[in-house]
């Protein structure tokens, strides 16, 4: 397959899909390819011995158990680095993963998968092209990238297509014979896309992880989308009615609103450690069969708290789309829906949320306080005219609200505040 064969817009697995897999690892690339993603991205820097290492950052600090500059490593020391996969992703991946050399990527994926390669260090473009030529990789199967116009010129002079990153300068790109521009999402408009297409230039936008944003950009006319969650952005593949927390699988659309959370192998749950703020994660993989009438069932457990029983809570936010919900910030523009809270003292609260701002609708009287380390079954039902929020188990209590202000609200976010909170057995029907 060549880039010319792809229907537009297509999705590029940014860093291999960094929200689902350990970024820029061979293991992560294999998952991306196994998911049917046609394009994987690499960030390539020159090493001290002239080798080429694949890593986004200029240091190894964030991604490995070591520290120091990428450029100070040789090819040998590069392969001795340990990717801190479990800590970075919150579980689900083993230790002992290694950052790849670009040669390894070409041996396994060259001419098999479409590659989108950024020359990350200022001296990387020429050796990247040399490596591609040496391995006999077809130029039709590669898009190079750079923010530097000089590097883009070099790529074009060697016969390779290139994305000029960070620009909307269509006139200059056309004059340089550059076939792609790569602006950030906030700089893309329908006018930019129209000007680019009129000049024979395509638009690759970065980095897009939410479907509401994707839909606007597709309507604007973009040709390619870089995404850290490429399966979620590409379509409905991977959507399901229940979680896979027990298998420690990061499903498509499991995106941090304010935090990522982590898996707990001891009981097959996922959740947040105690924190002096509110944290929340989108569960974009959940998809009800009928968005107009949904029932969400889950088990919630509260662990250590750092506030009183009225302040500490676990919560569910049901929203109209996948705008992030950031309850501890000054607001969450675009976040509309309903907030369901279980407080440490046992109170159930329901709020209507408009542009991220909650307004109380109803509360139960304080019931039996939550017992630390004990799961509580919860059920939320949304009909065309109302909401039911039920706590089961030893305490059977329901809050009923007549409100139809937001419909449908099929998008699930899970969170907690001032407490360690775990969730499991999440089912949306």
Predicted regions and their residues:
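Short tryptophan-centered beta-strand motifs in secreted/extracellular beta-sheet-rich domains
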Residues: 203, 298, 371-391
């Amino acid at each position: 397959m060549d880039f010319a064969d792809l229907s537009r817009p297509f999705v590029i697995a940014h860093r291999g899909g960094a929200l689902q897999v350990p970024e820029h690892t061979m293991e992560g690339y294999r998952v991306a390819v196994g998911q049917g993603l046609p394009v994987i991205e690499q960030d390539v820097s020159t090493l001290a011995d002239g080798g080429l290492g694949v890593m986004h950052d200029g240091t190894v600090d964030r991604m490995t158990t070591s520290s120091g500059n990428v450029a100070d490593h040789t090819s040998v020391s590069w392969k001795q680095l340990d990717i801190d996969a479990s800590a970075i992703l919150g579980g689900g991946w083993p230790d002992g993963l290694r950052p790849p050399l670009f040669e390894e990527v070409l041996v396994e994926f060259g001419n098999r998968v479409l590659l989108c390669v950024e020359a990350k260090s200022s001296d990387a473009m020429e050796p990247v092209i040399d490596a591609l030529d040496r391995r006999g990789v077809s130029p039709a199967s590669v898009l190079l990238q750079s923010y530097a116009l000089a590097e883009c010129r070099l790529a074009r002079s060697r016969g390779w297509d290139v994305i000029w990153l960070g620009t909307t300068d269509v006139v200059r790109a056309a004059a340089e014979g550059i076939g792609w521009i790569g602006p950030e999402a906030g700089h893309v408009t329908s006018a930019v896309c129209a000007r680019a297409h009129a000049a024979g230039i395509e638009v690759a936008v970065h980095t897009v992880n939410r479907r509401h944003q994707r839909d606007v950009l597709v309507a604007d006319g973009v040709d390619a989308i870089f995404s850290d969650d490429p399966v979620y952005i590409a379509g409905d593949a991977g959507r399901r009615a229940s979680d896979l927390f027990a298998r420690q699988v990061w499903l498509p659309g499991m995106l941090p609103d304010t935090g990522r959370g982590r898996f707990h192998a001891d009981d097959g749950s996922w959740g947040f450690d105690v924190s002096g703020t509110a944290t929340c994660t989108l569960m974009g993989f959940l998809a009800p069969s009928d968005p107009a009438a949904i029932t969400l069932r889950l088990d919630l457990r509260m662990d250590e708290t750092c506030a009183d029983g009225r302040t500490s809570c676990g919560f569910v936010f049901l929203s109209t789309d996948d705008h992030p919900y950031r309850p501890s910030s000054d607001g969450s523009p675009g976040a509309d829906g309903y907030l369901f809270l279980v407080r440490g003292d046992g109170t159930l609260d329901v709020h209507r949320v408009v542009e991220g701002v909650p307004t109380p609708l109803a509360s139960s009287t304080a019931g039996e306080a939550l017992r630390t380390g004990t799961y509580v079954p919860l059920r939320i039902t949304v009909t065309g005219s109302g909401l039911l929020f039920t706590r089961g188990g030893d305490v059977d209590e329901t809050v009923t609200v007549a409100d139809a202000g937001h419909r449908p609200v099929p998008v699930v976010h899970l969170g907690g505040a001032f407490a360690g909170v775990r969730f499991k057995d999440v089912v949306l029907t």
